[in-house]
Amino acid sequence: MQSMWEQQRNNNLTAKNAHMAVVACERYQAAENGHKFDRTLLPFDESCYTPLQLELFATNPVDFEFIEQKLENLPRQRQREYFRKLYLKAYRSVKDDGSIAFLLGNKQRRHANDYLRDILDVRLQKVFSQYNVNVDFLQAFINTPQWLLSVKDEMQQAVQFSTVPTREELAKHYNELHYSGFHFRLLGTQQKQKQLPFYLITESKLKKMAYEMATAFIRFQCDCSHFLKNGIEKDNEGDIQGYFYQLYKWCGEIAFSAGFKIPHWEKIENDKRIKAEHIDSTLIRLTCEKWWFKQMRDIQKRMVEHIAIACGEVRANAASYISNQSFQEWQLQQRKNHDYLRAMIIENIDNPEEQVELFDMFLKSSSNPALRRNEMMVRLRGLEEWAEENNNEALFLTLTAPSSFHAGNGNKKWLGVNPRETQNYLNKVWQQFRALLSKRNIKFYGMRVAEPHKDGTPHWHALAYVPAEHKEEVIRLFKQKALELDGNEKGAAEHRCKVEKCDKTKGSATAYIAKYIAKNIDGFALAGEVSDEDPTLSLHDNALRVRAWASRWGIRQFQFYGGASICVWRELRRLISGQADDEIINKAQAAAGIANDYAAYMEIQGGALAKRADQPIKLDYETKPANKYGEQRKAIIGLANRFSLKQVISRTKKWQIKKRPQDFAQRTESMVERSSTANNSARSAPWTCVSNCNRSILEQKIKLLTQPICAPLSAQKLDYLFKYKRLTIDKYTALELTENDVQLVKRNQNMMTSLSPVSRNFQKLKDFHKNQRIQ
């Protein structure tokens, strides 16, 4: 016999099913009558809805509110519209089997609802589980948090009723406060995001939260300091360090409960020691609202992009590598960056009249994608030449993550990981692979490129030079590590790791990776070609989207391993021939600055496999004042010979960034006129043949003249040209400056002997490289 509650339940279910059947029949009849439906049943006025919403209501009015509730937490209108379209597609994909369920629409509704739940409740939940940002906890900081008042009251009472606490009392209070940190974390896990998800909070709200967080940490650190200072023995360094270490842990627990990891927190989790200077800088960062805002904004942007990946917005035929919204945000930020560079100048501190546009300096630096590509190609060519001389062979390796790391095409194996986590996995595999080679005393060098699949998942291409006798062992170990995780899945051996032995008859080893460099920076020399990942994209557009993808996820696209220091190479190119008193530095300067020969430079530094400590030329630094976080800074001032201890200054001027004056162009023109008048007078000529303003005009002309044949000249080389009126560009060309004009001239043969002192063996090495290039 059924109980009363069971009978009531059955009656309710019967009434509900009858009501749903009536509504379904009305919907079916409306569809038969030309898809007409009663729009007065909509919760709001018809003008408040998009065409897809109206179509959705006409198709399935029974579940309309259920569907909209599922979609309301998606961060973008584009995503909500996308899922409405998918829902309608899933609804209409059900075939008519002649059943009553299909006639009433129940079968279609069930299939479409299950599809929507699978996407929004399963895939998105995998994303949300990785972000523990607690909005309720953050919003508590807008007013003084109750837990902070409680801790403050307890500390004041403890100070009021005790004069000098004993070590036992201090230990007790340490434990209480330490427990309070775990209490904060417990609060963070218990409270749920109720009203407004973190990824929907506006930027102005984030700034307010950042300010309140910084203010709360200032109060908390001050309260802890007042309480614990009585327990620190005077001049006892051990007690002081222990106090700051404990304060660091308390602050870390509070930040972790809010969903943020403070710097170096992984060392606490792994029970490792932290340097005192790292603790100090972290405690200062926690009191900086700008630091908090940057942390919140970065997490929010990556979370929104992660949701876009889970929703299928980043895929083929939609948006390759990065969502369209994030790509537009990146383009807008690039324009803002360029506008800032154009709005600023750099000024010589010692000579304020010498001013240069900051944007021009950007174009001359390695931040310029074109120059960065040129520099990488020079390095790769040098590595290849050095490998040929030392009988090393080239391997082209491709490393891809398992299928569970890929979100594309509704992959049910997807673990919910984002591109940054996949990059960390690839890094770990590569580190373990290098460790295996190191144990076998196998050394290798080369370069790797990280690029995305269509769904944003990164994969690697690597060019590796290895000794010929170890080539097969390197291939075996690489495949072993690449297939260590889920190596038995279908297609793993074919798609997840590829090894190609570079064939010189098909092209140089550098050519194997040159295309991947160009298509991930600026698409240079690839006009008319399309992307391998997305044939609808030109390689120029492909490069822009890849750069935006790398910026959003903080992924390093290019990395060399082995070889000599690139920073030393750049400083050598700033020097003038014969400027150094050290013979080795002068030889390296001739290789880097005149011959542009990276292989010869590596030979001087000890070869591609030399350790940094064994390379004779190193950077020379000067200590600068600490930054606002109390961290000591170092600035490059030149080069030094590690063994002879001789130094050379490559940066003779100190600059400061200033806002560009509104009359900068007019002042430039007037200074040109004054310079012209001064040059026609009987006064003695200054050390430079042009004024600062006229110099900027000549620099633009020099830039146009040298652009087809070399990289932009450094400031030191320009100074040399303006002082001595002649500068060697390469073995065949020089620049001459005459009467406020500059031109390219052919070098005289008798000048070839006036180069910086180069040993006979080094000259033979350079001639050998030249002959190899001609061949």
From Swiss-Prot:
Its EC number is 3.1.-.-. It is an enzyme of class 3 (hydrolase). Possible endonuclease which induces a single-strand cut and initiates DNA replication. Keywords: DNA replication, Endonuclease, Hydrolase, Nuclease, Viral DNA replication. It comes from Haemophilus phage HP1 (strain HP1c1) (Bacteriophage HP1). It holds the Pfam family Phage_GPA. Belongs to the phage GPA family. Disulfide bonds: none annotated. GO terms for molecular function: endonuclease activity. InterPro entries: Replication_gene_A-like (IPR008766). The active site is at residues 512, 516. It comes from the Viruses. GO terms for biological process: DNA replication; viral DNA genome replication. This is Replication protein.
